[in-house]
């Protein structure tokens, strides 16, 4: 404890004025012991010799304390206190009575003797009695102070005040006949308690030991001090610490006082338990927040628990864990923090071994047995981890310290996350040692898994290390088996290899990869001179059988290794160009193709990749050409390269003569014959298949096995073929000065090159025919659209089109199809225009359908629906009063190919809107005295009513409705009776009125029609 704080606490507790430095943050509180402290200052100093005849049950009080550091020196008795100290309560009571009686008697006797009067004697008795009473009062008033001094001196005699018992304190109180609640006695108890608490708390630079709470609680119970009084002493200590903190000017001193205060808060919280929340008002008195109190409790609890953990080593047992759990609960440490601290402690224990192992592993002067030392340290780690794992599954694990379980170096403030490479070295060392015997035991496999978790390695990282080390061990054992002949002598080599993998816990697929790698290395050694001899083939076969390598793996290895050599030869041959592919180059190709023992398919696949790469370069340059002629020239170079280089190289690879013509596929020949019969009129297509004389003149044809079919999209291949076809058809265009140009026609040999181009591009016969037909149709269509500009097909135009067809060479069916499409398109445009302009009705539509004109394709659905709506509108405005449901709902929608339900909705909407309009129109015509128009409008009203039956209609002037009915019923020709009755119902006219209107003369109509303009 800070010495200055001890000095301050050793001073008597008195209500001294507050320091100005503390008053601004400490609230004004009434001092708890002001009265008793005032009494302590009114002690009298009276010299009385100490009697040596004290009773045997009296507690002796020495003049010098044995332990002045805590409670100071013994206090001396002054004034009446030595006399009071000698008296027991009965003696003190008797003495008080004697003194009082003697005083009264003495006063009475003196007054009577001196004055001779009884009144004066009574007065003297009263005065003497008062004096005696004062003596008695002083004597009794000194008792609590004497008891307090006796208690102080008694406690000061002990070297360890904790030895004081509750019985000792009660004996002192009983001896003097005082109550423990007496202010002076209670003040002394509080002072003793305050001094003891101060002495128990750690001094400057020290930490809590963990026994402070037990000592304070024991001493508090021994003194019998009340909880509120004890809490007040803790608050007083806190005030003094705060005061000293304000008086301290140094930063270090301030920090130390802050730590001292946090220790006080923590110890106080444990001493008073749950009652500390209201017994210790830190926030109200010292402005300390609840969060700061929680931090003080948490940090000190962590410090104490950490100190307890230091006592636990790697030989931890059940008793240690139970004690740690009890300590955690007594320290008020949360389970989460306790778990973190325990894991950190176990991590530190393991780190010692890990660090030792790393230092050995990285030592430059490490001995040959360094690996064994490293493994020994790691075994200690695993042993400690297994101990914790077993304790975690203990039957009484719920009573153990929190955090018992497997260890991991990763987490919290550990720096091993940045030293992952070092941990990998340790793991590798352990795996290497586990496989040092040539096999991997089950217990080692489990230990490797645990070590991986402890070191915090990822599953992939650990697996990579294990596979690497196991692969080396597998290679070593495999080499021994091969060199010793054990593997070759086995009847079942697969079982032997499988057993080897099981002993090492090695994956069979990874073992197969090692076998493949060994085979590849052997193969590379055999082909160093560019070919495989018979001895090499035999050695490779022997190795393949011993290692059980599948044929597919062997073929893949040969294709890659031998193929790489062959590919280089092919590239050199191709790079020599058209002129450089001589006999020497052909010889090297033949040697590589057959000496490397490549299959024909593999060799052709390798050559195909290289050739197609060159073809692609030609195609790229052809696309980048400025015009069609330059593009065709690049394509011609590609055709020449295919004929002079690729064709020869393919023959060399196959071992055939290049002069031998390739065999034609009979199915393909049949397809070409069928196409010749169908499209023989196409001159451009016919020229691509020349006669024998021209074929012999052009020389041997090019190969068609290596094509660009899978390298270019269909659209690009067709465009390239079409480009060269147009070049063959139009010829070469040469520009001359003054803006003129000369077109040079090409001979039929260009069409043979076109045929070879089709083979290089991988176009089928059908695709080639479609290209030729498409160009012919395009040429014919362009000319035919000019001839049929107005869509009219006359006899002269037919003859003109026939002549054009012969020139183009387009077959008759195709020509007729083009002509029909042109005329149909022209007609569709004309029909659509007529519909939009309203010049086409349903009658004309039916005539067109009878003429086999497809209206569905010529007229859009929206236009057909528009035409239907116009037709229905004409019916509702025709003035006939007729509405044929079959015609409107079925026949017309069928003729126009529209939806029937949708047609019905259109009819209903029109009928409902035209119903009221027809009535308004009829009234308007009535006012204009247009009787004929009135009849027509009423017929339209009846037609709408037939489509959608209506309710009786209302009108403001009922006489006008009567006039409408009268005019309609008397119209000429006379309407049908059912129409008259329906109109009567719609106009809301009763039978009597209807009869009167029919019998009324024409001139007797109401004048409502004449006045209608004003009414309206």
UniProtKB/Swiss-Prot annotation:
Keywords: Acetylation, Chloroplast, Membrane, Plastid, Plastid inner membrane, Protein transport, Transit peptide, Transmembrane, Transmembrane helix, Transport
Consequence of gene disruption: Embryo lethal.
Sites bearing N-acetylserine, chain numbering: 52
GO biological process: chloroplast organization; protein import into chloroplast stroma
The UniProt record lists the keyword Glycosyltransferase: no
This protein's GO CC annotations: chloroplast; chloroplast envelope; extracellular region; plastid; Tic complex; TOC-TIC supercomplex I
Chain segment of the transit peptide: 1-51
UniProt xrefs under InterPro entries: TIC110
Chloroplast intermembrane-side positions: 117-118, 281-368, 651-719
Tissue and organ expression note: Expressed in seedlings, flowers, leaves, stems and roots.
Stromal face of the membrane: 52-95, 140-259, 387-632, 737-1016
Stretches that traverse the bilayer: 96-116, 119-139, 260-280, 369-386, 633-650, 720-736
Residue stretches of biased makeup (Acidic residues): 670-680
Keyword Calcium attached: no
Location within or outside the cell: Plastid, Chloroplast inner membrane
UniProt function note: Involved in protein precursor import into chloroplasts. Forms a voltage-dependent cation-selective channel at the inner envelope of chloroplasts, which specifically responds to a transit peptide. Associates with both the precursor and mature forms of the preprotein.
Subunit structure: Part of the Tic complex. Interacts with HSP70, HSP93 and TIC40. Interacts with the Toc complex components TOC33, TOC75 and TOC159. Interacts with LTD.
Family from the record: Belongs to the chloroplast envelope anion channel-forming Tic110 (TC 1.A.18) family.
More info: The region 143-1016 is indicated to be located in the stroma while the homologous region in pea TIC110 contains probably 4 trans-membrane domains resulting in 2 regions in the intermembrane space localized to form supercomplexes with the TOC machinery and to receive the transit peptide of preproteins. Inserts into the inner envelope membrane from the stroma after import from the cytoplasm.
Record comment regarding domains: An internal domain (143-652) is sufficient for assembly into supercomplex with Toc complex. Residues 235-420 contain a binding site for preprotein transit peptides.
Listed name of the protein: Protein TIC110, chloroplastic
């Amino acid at each position: 404890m800070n010495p200055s704080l001890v000095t301050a606490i050793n001073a008597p507790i008195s209500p001294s004025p507050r320091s100005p430095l503390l008053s601004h943050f400490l609230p004004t509180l009434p001092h708890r012991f002001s009265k008793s402290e005032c009494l302590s200052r009114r002690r009298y100093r009276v010299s009385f010799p100490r009697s040596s005849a004290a009773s045997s049950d009296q507690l002796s009080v020495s003049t010098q304390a044995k332990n002045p550091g805590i409670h100071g020196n013994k206090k001396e008795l002054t004034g009446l206190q030595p006399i009071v100290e000698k008296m027991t309560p009965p003696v003190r009571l008797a003495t008080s009575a004697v003194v009082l009686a003697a005083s009264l008697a003495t006063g009475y006797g003196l007054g009577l003797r001196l004055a001779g009067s009884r009144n004066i004697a009574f007065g003297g008795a009263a005065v003497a009695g008062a004096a005696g009473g004062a003596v008695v009062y002083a004597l009794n008033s000194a008792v609590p102070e004497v008891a307090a001094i006796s208690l102080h001196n008694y406690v000061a005699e002990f070297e360890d005040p904790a030895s004081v018992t509750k019985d000792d304190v009660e004996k002192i109180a009983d001896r003097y006949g005082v109550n423990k609640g007496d202010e002076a006695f209670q003040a002394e108890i509080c002072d003793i308690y305050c001094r003891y608490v101060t002495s128990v708390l750690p001094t400057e630079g020290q930490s809590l030991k963990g026994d402070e709470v037990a000592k304070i609680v024991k001493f508090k119970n021994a003194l019998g001090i009340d909880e509120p009084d004890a809490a007040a002493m803790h608050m007083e200590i806190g005030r003094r610490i705060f005061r000293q903190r304000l008086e301290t000017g140094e930063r270090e001193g301030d920090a130390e006082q802050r730590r001292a205060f946090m220790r006080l808060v923590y110890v106080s919280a444990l001493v008073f338990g749950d009652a500390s929340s209201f017994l210790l008002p830190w926030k109200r008195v010292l402005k300390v927040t609840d969060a700061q109190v929680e931090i003080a409790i948490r940090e000190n609890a962590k410090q104490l628990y950490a100190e307890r953990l230091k006592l636990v080593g790697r030989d931890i047992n059940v008793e240690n864990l139970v004690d740690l759990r009890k300590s955690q609960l007594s320290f008020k440490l949360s389970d989460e923090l306790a778990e973190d601290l325990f894991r950190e402690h176990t991590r530190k224990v393991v780190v010692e071994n890990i660090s030792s192992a790393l230092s050995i592993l990285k030592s430059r002067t490490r001995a040959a047995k360094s690996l064994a030392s490293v493994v020994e340290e790691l075994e200690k780690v695993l042993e400690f981890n297994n101990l914790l794992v077993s304790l975690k599954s203990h039957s009484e694990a719920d009573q153990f310290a929190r955090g018992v379980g497997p260890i991991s170096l990763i987490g919290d403030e550990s720096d091993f996350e940045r030293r992952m490479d070092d941990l990998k070295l340790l793991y590798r060392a352990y795996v290497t040692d586990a496989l040092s015997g040539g096999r991997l035991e089950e217990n080692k496999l489990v230990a490797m898994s645990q070590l991986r978790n402890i070191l915090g390695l990822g599953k992939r990282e650990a697996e990579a290390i294990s596979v690497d080390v196991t692969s080396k061990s597998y290679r070593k054992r495999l080499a021994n088996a091969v060199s010793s002949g054990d593997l070759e002598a086995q009847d079942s080599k697969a079982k032997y290899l499988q057993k080897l993998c099981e002993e090492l816990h090695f994956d069979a697929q990874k073992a197969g990869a090692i076998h493949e790698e060994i085979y590849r290395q052997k193969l590379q050694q055999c082909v160093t001179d560019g070919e495989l001899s018979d001895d090499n083939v035999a050695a490779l076969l022997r190795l393949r059988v011993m290692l059980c390598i599948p044929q597919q793996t062997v073929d893949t290895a040969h294709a890659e290794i031998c193929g790489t050599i062959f590919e280089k030869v092919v590239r050199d041959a191709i790079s020599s160009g058209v002129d450089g592919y001589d006999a020497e180059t052909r010889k090297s190709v033949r040697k590589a193709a057959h000496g490397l023992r490549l299959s024909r398919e593999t060799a052709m696949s390798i050559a195909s990749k290289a050739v197609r790469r060159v073809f692609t370069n030609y195609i790229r340059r052809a696309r980048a050409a400025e015009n069609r002629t330059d593009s065709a020239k690049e394509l011609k170079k590609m055709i020449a390269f295919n004929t002079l280089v690729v064709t020869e190289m393919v023959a060399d690879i196959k071992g055939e003569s290049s002069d031998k013509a390739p065999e034609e596929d009979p199915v393909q020949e049949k397809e070409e014959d069928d196409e010749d019969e169908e499209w023989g009129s196409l001159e451009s297509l016919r020229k691509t298949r020349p006669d024998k004389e021209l074929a012999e003149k052009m020389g041997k044809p090019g190969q068609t096995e290596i094509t660009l079919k899978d390298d270019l999209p269909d659209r690009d291949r067709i465009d390239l073929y079409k480009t060269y076809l147009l070049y063959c058809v139009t010829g070469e265009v040469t520009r001359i000065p003054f803006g003129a140009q000369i077109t040079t026609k090409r001979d039929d040999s260009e069409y043979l090159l076109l045929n070879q181009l089709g083979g290089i591009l991988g176009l089928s016969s059908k695709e080639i025919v479609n290209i030729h037909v498409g160009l012919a149709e395009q040429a014919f269509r362009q000319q035919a659209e000019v001839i049929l500009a107005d869509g009219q097909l006359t006899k002269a135009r037919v003859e003109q089109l026939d002549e054009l067809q012969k020139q183009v060479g387009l077959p008759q069916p195709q020509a007729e199809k083009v002509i029909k499409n042109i005329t149909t398109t022209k007609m569709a445009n004309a029909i659509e225009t007529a519909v939009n302009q309203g010049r086409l009705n349903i009658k004309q539509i039916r005539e067109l359908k009878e003429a086999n004109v497809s209206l569905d394709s010529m007229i859009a659905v929206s236009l057909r629906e528009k035409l239907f709506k116009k037709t229905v509108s004409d019916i509702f405005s025709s003035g006939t009063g007729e509405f044929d449901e079959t015609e409107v709902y079925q026949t017309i929608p069928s003729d126009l190919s529209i939806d029937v339900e949708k047609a019905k909705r259109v009819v209903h909407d029109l009928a409902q809107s035209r119903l009221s309009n027809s009535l308004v129109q009829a009234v308007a015509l009535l006012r204009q005295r247009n009787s004929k128009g009135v009849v027509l409008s009423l017929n339209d009203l009846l037609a709408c009513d037939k489509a959608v039956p209506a309710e009786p209609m209302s009108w403001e002037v009922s006489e006008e409705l009567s006039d409408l009915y009268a005019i309609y019923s008397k119209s000429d020709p006379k309407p049908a009776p059912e129409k008259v009755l329906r109109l009567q119902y719609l106009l809301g006219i009763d039978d009597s009125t209807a009869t009167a209107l029919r019998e009324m003369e024409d001139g007797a109509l109401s004048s409502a029609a004449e006045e209608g303009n004003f009414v309206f």
